[in-house]
A protein has these predicted regions:
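Vicinal oxygen chelate
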Residues: 2-9, 23-25, 31-33, 37, ...
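Hydrophobic ligand-binding cavity/cleft-lining segments
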Residues: 12-23
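A structural signal for well-ordered alpha-helical scaffolds and beta->alpha junctions
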Residues: 14, 60, 111-112
C-alpha cells in the first residue's frame, strides 16, 4: 500500500510562506475541520474565526498553516513556525516543474516566464543554468520570500 506524502517547511511566518507556495503551485488553503466554506470564502479568515472560537490566543494563530492540491494529486504542504534561523545548507530542494517535456529555447522561455511570475509573488532569482544536453535540460534557481535561503528550481 502506498503512503501519502506531506512536505513540511520550517518558517518564521507560516501564513505568509504558505500563501506564497499556494499561489506558486496553484494549491488551496483548506478550511478548518467541520466548517463548510462557501466557494468565495477566505479560508484563512475562516481559520482565524475558528481558532478564536476555540480559545487559541491571537499571538498563537500563525504558528501553523497548510496548503493542498485541489485535485488531490500532489502532496500536502505544511508550514510550522520555528524561532531559529536556518543553521546549515538544505539537502533537499523543490523543483517547480513548469516546462515538463520541453527542450532548448522553448523550455527556457517557459521557465523565464515562470520565474517572472514567481518573482512577482515574492521569490528571488538566483541564477540560470543553461541546457547542457543530453542530461541537463536547463533550469533557474530561485529562493522563496520567507528565508531567502531555501532554494527551489523552475524546471
Amino acid at each position: 500500500m502506498s503512503r501519502h506524502l506531506q512536505v513540511t517547511f520550517d518558517a518564521h511566518d507560516p501564513r505568509a510562506l504558505s500563501s506564497f507556495w499556494r499561489d506558486a503551485l496553484g494549491y488551496v488553503h483548506p478550511g478548518p475541520p467541520g466548517v463548510d466554506l462557501p466557494e468565495d470564502a477566505d479560508p484563512l479568515a475562516a481559520w482565524d474565526d475558528f481558532l478564536a472560537r476555540i480559545g487559541v490566543p491571537e499571538e498563537q494563530r500563525n504558528t501553523k498553516s497548510a496548503i493542498e492540491d485541489p485535485d488531490g494529486h500532489g502532496p500536502r504542504v505544511f508550514f510550522q513556525q520555528v524561532p531559529e534561523d536556518k543553521a546549515a545548507k538544505n539537502r533537499v530542494h523543490l523543483d517547480v516543474r513548469a516546462a515538463p517535456g520541453l527542450r532548448g529555447k522553448e523550455r527556457m522561455a517557459v521557465l523565464e516566464a515562470e520565474c517572472d511570475r514567481l518573482v512577482a509573488l515574492g521569490a528571488a532569482r538566483v541564477r540560470r543554468h543553461e541546457p547542457a544536453p543530453p542530461m541537463n535540460a536547463g533550469f533557474i534557481v530561485m529562493t522563496d520570500p520567507n528565508t531567502r535561503d531555501y532554494q527551489f528550481c523552475a524546471a
